[in-house]
Amino acid sequence: MHAIMVPIGKLIKDILDERGLTATWLADKIPCGRANIYKIFNKNSIDTELLLRICIVLEHDFFKYYSQEMKE
């Protein structure tokens, strides 16, 4: 069994960029500090509760990237 590698932070940043949203906007919505959002952008893993909050705020299923990785 191998570790599932999903560049989740980059994926979150990409969605924000596509929508013209900022780290400050996301930090206000989650809520958490803006500095923490920038740390998230550089991570390859994330707490599931935090990821769920991000999914809800952005209305985007980031969990699907892990499911796709498991199928490959």
What does each of the following model-derived ranges do?
Residues 18, 29, 57:
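Residues within the alpha-helical elements of helix-turn-helix
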Residues 25-27:
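Short alpha-helical "recognition helix" segments of helix-turn-helix
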Residues 15, 29, 40, 68:
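Residues in the recognition helix of alpha-helical DNA-binding motifs
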Residues 66-72:
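Short amphipathic recognition helices of helix-turn-helix/homeodomain-type DNA-binding modules
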Residues 49-65:
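DNA major-groove recognition helix of helix-turn-helix/homeodomain DNA-binding modules
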Residues 31-46:
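Recognition helix of helix-turn-helix/homeodomain-like DNA-binding domains
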Residues 1-22:
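A short, Lys/Arg-rich alpha-helix, primarily the initiator
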